[in-house]
């Protein structure tokens, strides 16, 4: 083979399908502490050695014509008549609860770090991520990306005047 990939972490997924329907009306995906570590085999002339860490990946979707679900308050799983109680949050993995609010469409936070080196060939990089022949690229970066729907007070009077606005946010630290 040319490369090897190691994957670890937690993933939880759920969907809600109305009785009589065949397609899901609501779906959610959450990932946490996911680590992806690829490495190219020696002698290939191409090197890929690093770790992509996904601290969190949240995705909340609804079918056309429906608002996204508030997963933290949508269920009465223990049948006690209280919706969104302590025992009413979906937690299929036991480690990662599905509890996104309806305002969140997606969120991603993570980092990438090179863990190879070219010091054996006289180089000075100790955090090589990618190599191709004599070219080496190294370093690390952290990132976040999110999209949510919120109400916005655009004039500072304490009242929302832009309702249901989409807010996209991105951060990158190198």
What do the predicted segments below correspond to?
Residues 1-174:
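N-terminal low-complexity, acidic/Ser/Thr/Gly/Pro-rich segments
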